[in-house]
Structure formats: structure tokens, C-alpha cells
Amino acid sequence: MSELHSFIFEGLPVRGQIVRLTDSWQEVLSRRDGSQTGPWPLPVRNLLGEMAAASLLMQSSIKFNGALELQIQGDGPIKLAVAEAQPDLSFRATAKVMAGIDDHAHLADLVNGNGQGRCAITLDPQDRQPGQQPYQGIVPLAAADGTRLQRLSDMIQHYMRQSEQLDTVLVLSLIHI
């Protein structure tokens, strides 16, 4: 089960959401654990868990009936990581891992080794008309000064400032059970 709770602070220009992934995330992990390729390394599991939570938060914060896909492509050991969220809080997440991964690797190490990483957020309407293309915004995995971003939350905040011109604070936390 996934849970989503929204809140506001009266008299302040602040609103927020909390998402909690439990059984649904465990199902994603158990499917991968039982696959021929075996479990993801811990940094990949962590990244995908954060991506799943972030995609659900973003999908639920906009008035949109369709899928929101958060995709990271890069030149590190993870070539591609994708999380897709639906309005009913269902989601899926996967990654294409091409090389060994250090247990302490950060986002920059995983997907942005040589500074070529990109983040794409795609909105795919459920009632898309023939010929209509999904909306997609793409930003580099680097700050304005070229510094490689180390955390997914930094990357999404950067995306929201660059692509949506929206000041955003995102806190992602994992609790391993």
C-alpha cells in the first residue's frame, strides 16, 4: 500500500505532501530479487525508492490525469533509471545497471560520471488524442555553475527551478525494513 498525505500552513505560502511506500515498494523489490539478474545493489535500490516516492509526490501535486515518468539517463554505471507514477498511487520503477556499483555511491557517481547525465520528466495524459505528444521537460544533472548534483532531491529541485520556474524544497528519506 502507498499512502499520500497533503498539508498546508495557514497564512503561509507553504504546502506539502508526505508519501509513504510500504507493501507496494516491497513488491517491486521482491519481483527484482526473484528475477534472473537478482537484487539491485543498495545504492540502486535507494535511488529507485527515492525516484518512486518523488514521482508520486510530483504526480499528485498537479491537476493531471495520466502518468508522470521521472527518468534519469547518464554515463555512469546506471545508464537509465525510471519511475512512473499513476494518479491512483500505483507505480513502477526499474534501472539498467551496466557496471559494478560502490556501496557508498551518490547520484553523480551512479549516473553522471562524466557530466553527461540528464533528467527528464514526462507527463503522458490518459486521454491523449491521436497525434498529441506527451509533455517532456529535460535538464542536465548539474547545477547552473556546472557542479554535479549529488542527491535526487537536489536534482528535482534544480529541475523545478529550471523547467517550471518554481521554488521547491524536497526532502527524501529512506527507512529500510
Regions flagged by a language model, labelled:
Residues 1-173:
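General detector of N-terminal leader/presequence modules that precede the first folded domain
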Residues 175-177:
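Conserved small/polar residues in nucleotide/adenosyl-binding loops
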